[in-house]
UniProtKB/Swiss-Prot annotation:
The keyword Transmembrane helix applies. The gene is Ermard. It comes from Rattus norvegicus (Rat). This is Endoplasmic reticulum membrane-associated RNA degradation protein. May play a role in neuronal migration during embryonic development. InterPro entries: DUF4209, ERMARD.
Length: 678
């Protein structure tokens, strides 16, 4: 493993950004009277603050540098004012004005951090305040607007917020957190550029007071407009259970991380206080705080690796306002901004990249960074499991960037080796391919319920006679022929399936499990592969709906049969249902097998030309249409069981024709006619 060398870096802020944040606001030495900024009962005098904002001579564009310079003394006065208050005084004077954010207790914690004078804690406070403020401002936006902007800078620039708070007030916020031309405190911290000593505490104090001032302005607006502020519900982390692969964090793991972070070249020494605070927050069960710190420092460390392996050391620093920062978006991408291949994915390896994409990027993953940074999660209820997984992953990553002979005893411990092994075997769990595997297995489990549901013997005998009709026999024959064809592409370990006898069965379940445990390459999937996966997942979802409906109908009709509440027509329909179910179960099982096999070979779609790809997608969409119609026909409202059989025969004919022409993806699998599930 190549080791990152040379830790002489004192800041990750570019010269202009460093000057803007660390120096410019200290150049004016005037002393501001705090009474001109805030009244004795805590009301913010906004004009004293907005008058400090400067604009370009022509037009209304902000002069960010001059604004930062002129706001410096105001921030200093606010900081001294906040510092002069006891906790009780601060709570009495300002807590009522934080209620609009739904997290008033957060601002007391920020006060405590300022009192502690711990730089890392103050930086964390700015991160938390920015995300909380963004969420609260989004709620205010929705008083007037319909769709809240995703990015904070777009939210602050919106006409809706300017209408509520005034343009001048919004310009003040832009200087602090809304533009790369200003202090941009939110982004330099959340993206891991700013070290603890880079953030002057007075800016945290200023944001603390400004948020209270916004609460005062909002109260006035709500009073005059007679409207009520509604808060959007917090979101939960999607599919978090899927990405839990490491055991829970133990004291041994925490101790190991504390040791490794002082030896690993992954992190810059100027960032060490953040790592120390992250461990401390985990120990005190502040899991959201821990995760916020780890995310920003994971990005900082990976940016360092990115800059090294791609031979672009300047990318370690914040870019100037005219250039995009190097963030997770580019660090984890296939290509760099100039179009060249990003070397970091190859260097880190697919398992590590899969983990990062699962946690951060995939739409069906927890997307922890987005959720936390935009204030979408209730940080008081942030799950320990999420913090545990990220912390353990960071430990394994830091170990990779230690000298070979360093910490040799620690690396040889069984508990540590287990974590390394789990990380090295990680496979994506939030990519659409894995989610399809989950869906197929879930539906197969549902289908296994059908034969074991209680059924009246008399109705079963009638249904059995109906199953002998010509259409049902034709369907059974087609199923057998298609299965016989698919058998050539099953894993070598699978037993041959003869007709319907193996549908469904214990071996059938084992077969689908084996197919769905096949590792599918997921990183940087091409568009055509994703298009195929969308349709395959649509088919699987509809199959699940059919199964759920059939189970619910069978249970209801059986209960009505036992209770003698079935009318004559319902009884006849029940018999037709039982007859159709005997056919639909193997058909749905066949479709699940087809989905599993096509998924294993999904990358073979590249072997088709453009016309063949479109033909293949039309074939899949035909099956999708069938399953959608089946959902309608098997619903309690329609109960069109005979029509469902006719529909089934038509789709089986199309599947057989397509299969006979060797046009499915399994037919394009090279070198072998068996699926390799190793």
């Amino acid at each position: 493993m190549e080791i990152l060398t040379g830790d002489s870096i004192t800041t990750c802020l570019s010269p202009l950004v460093h000057d803007l944040i660390c120096n410019l606001g200290f150049e004016l030495t005037e002393i501001c009277d705090i009474n001109s900024i805030v009244t004795q009962n805590g009301e913010v005098r906004w004009k004293a603050i907005t008058d400090r904002v400067s604009y370009a001579e022509l037009g209304h564009s902000l002069d960010y540098r001059q604004s930062v310079q002129r706001l410096g003394p105001v921030c200093e006065a606010i900081h001294l004012h906040i510092s002069s208050l006891s906790r009780a005084q601060f709570e009495t004077q300002y807590s009522p004005w934080y209620q609009w954010t739904t997290s008033p207790e957060l601002f007391l914690e920020i006060y405590d951090a300022l009192e502690s004078s711990q730089s890392a804690a103050i930086s964390l406070s700015v991160m938390k305040l920015a995300s909380c403020l963004e969420r609260a401002l989004g709620d205010v936006f929705l008083l007037i607007g319909n769709e809240c902007p995703f990015l904070l800078r777009d939210l602050l620039a919106s006409a809706e917020l300017a209408h509520v708070f005034g343009h001048a007030v919004m310009d003040v916020l832009k200087v602090f957190i809304g533009s790369p031309c200003g202090l941009n405190l939110r982004n330099v911290l959340w993206h891991g550029f700013a070290s603890p000593q880079d953030i002057p505490p007075k800016y945290c104090s200023a944001l603390l007071l400004l948020t209270a001032g916004l609460g005062q302005l909002l109260k006035s607006y709500l009073h005059h407009t007679k409207v009520q502020l509604a808060h959007r519900p917090f979101v939960t982390l999607t599919n978090l259970e899927d990405v839990i692969v490491f055991p829970g964090v133990t004291d041994k793991v925490l101790s190991a991380l504390e040791t490794v972070m002082t030896k690993s070249s992954f992190l810059l020494k100027i960032m060490l206080p953040y790592w120390e605070l992250a461990v401390s927050k985990f120990k005190s069960h502040r899991f959201a705080d821990c995760t916020m710190l780890l995310l920003s420092q994971l990005e900082a460390g990976l940016r360092r690796v990115f800059a090294t392996v791609n031979k672009c050391p300047d990318r370690l620093l914040t870019a100037e306002s005219t250039i995009l920062y190097t963030t997770f978006d580019e660090i984890l991408a296939k290509h760099m901004s100039d179009g060249s291949i990003n070397q970091l994915p190859c260097f880190l390896g697919e398992p590590a990249m899969d983990f990062l994409w699962d946690f951060l990027n995939y739409q069906e993953g927890p997307r922890i960074r987005d959720r936390l940074s935009h204030g979408e999660i209730n940080i008081r209820e942030f799950p320990k499991a999420a913090a545990s997984q990220l912390l353990t992953f960071c430990l394994v990553l830091l170990l990779r960037f230690t000298e070979e002979d360093t910490l040799s005893e620690l690396k040889e411990e069984a508990a540590i080796q287990l974590l390394v092994s789990l990380a090295e075997r990680y496979r994506s769990r939030c990519h659409p391919a894995f989610q399809l595997q989950k869906q197929v297995l879930s539906c197969e489990k549902s289908l296994r319920m059908w034969p074991v549901l209680p059924l009246p013997e008399e109705c079963c005998q009638e249904a059995g006679r109906s199953e002998g009709n010509s259409e049902a026999c034709a369907c059974n024959s087609l199923i057998s022929k298609i299965l016989c064809e698919l058998c050539h592409y099953l894993p070598a370990s699978a037993c041959a399936i003869n007709g319907l006898d193996g549908l469904p069965s214990e071996k059938w379940s084992q077969l689908l499990n084996e197919l769905c445990n096949t590792r599918i390459p997921t990183l940087f999937c091409p568009k055509i592969v994703l298009e195929v996966l969308v349709v395959l997942r649509g088919i699987s979802s509809q199959c699940q709906r059919v199964s759920d409906q059939v189970i619910a109908s069978l249970q209801l009709r059986h209960r009505q049969w036992v209770e003698h509440t079935l009318r004559s027509r319902q009884r006849q329909n029940y018999v037709r249902m039982l007859s159709s179910v005997g056919l639909l179960c193997p058909v749905l099982s066949l479709i699940l097998l087809l989905l599993a096999l096509e998924l294993v070979s999904v990358h073979a779609v590249h072997g088709k030309d453009a016309q063949e790809r479109q033909q293949y997608l039309r074939f899949l969409k035909l099956i999708l249409q069938y399953t959608e119609n089946l959902v309608a026909y098997t619903s309690r409202q329609k109960n069109k069981w005979n029509e469902a059989v006719s529909l089934t025969r038509a789709v089986l004919l199309r599947i057989w024709t397509f299969s006979e022409k060797k046009q499915m993806l399994i037919h394009l699998t090279k070198n072998t006619n068996k699926v390799d599930t190793g």
